[in-house]
Amino acid sequence: MKRRDALKIMGAGVASVFMLNIAPKTHAAILKDREKSKKRLVFYFTATGNSLFIAKQFSDAPLSIPQELKKGNLIYEADEIGFVFPDYAASAPMIVREFIEKAQFKADYIFSVITFGNASVNVAEWWNNFAKGHGLNNNYVNSILMVDNYLPVFDMNEQMKIDKKTDENIATIISDIIARKDFIAPSDMGWFTEDMLKNMQDMHFSQKCNQLIKLDTGRCIECSTCIDVCPRGNFSLTPEGLEYDGKCEFCLACIQNCPQHALSLERERNKDARYRHPDVSLNEIKRANKQ
């Protein structure tokens, strides 16, 4: 065989291996590669896994806000800092607010991604203003539509049937953050008014868990799941059985993750339907929230 022919065969072989084994990187992979060269910290709060799933698109090791709050020195510095959390009544969960109030952050680029299930309304603007009031200046705030896990209003079985185009939307957000885009999502109030939102927030954040959550003692097997997933540590096992008290985050992690459906709200759209993101395990939520 002539040398030139041998080189042609070798070149074809190398090309075929290259084509078989080297696939274009996803946006998430590119972002994680940059995480290795630049220091990026991503903080999240989750109850059913939506926000944790999104946080994992930006970091291989996102940091749980309930766990970070246990630490004494809440001072963070990085090239990029991100926050991922759910929209609660067009605002942030109280535990996220508490973290922002207590911690200090320094970064060249700060981004926030807020998960929601029905209408984002003015949550990006609200969060940007709240954060700015506590010395945190966002370069980028956007929201992403996912399964709505708010049990009083939505049937989880019906929600899971809806294609909310999460993959396409997260790809856009990742592209924005790779480019370090400056963007604050505009408000879309729809039929909501400021007074309506204030009433919703007052109702949502004033709950005590022993008034809100109902326990079916016949179903409860004292498995401790509710204890492990509650970010406020409101549940405990006593000789008399499961007890719970304290100010409720109203995240519904206890109800959604109970394997026996022993916990519920007084009013739900479908008490037989529960939700956890399919790519997030119960153990991940326990590790994120256990007090």
Q: Positions of the model-derived regions?
A:
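N-terminal export signals
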Residues: 5-27
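C-terminal segment of N-terminal export signals and the immediately downstream linker at the start
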Residues: 22-47, 53-54, 60
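Flanking helices and flexible, charged tails adjoining ferredoxin-like Fe-S electron-transfer domains
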Residues: 28, 250-291
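Short gly/ser/thr-rich secondary-structure transition/capping motifs
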Residues: 61-69, 238
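Helix-loop-strand module that forms the ligand-binding subsite of alpha/beta enzymes
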Residues: 66-148
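Ferredoxin-type iron-sulfur electron-transfer modules and their immediate structural context
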Residues: 138-221, 228, 269, 276-291
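Iron-sulfur cluster-binding cysteine motifs and their immediate structural context
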Residues: 215-216, 221-249, 253-270
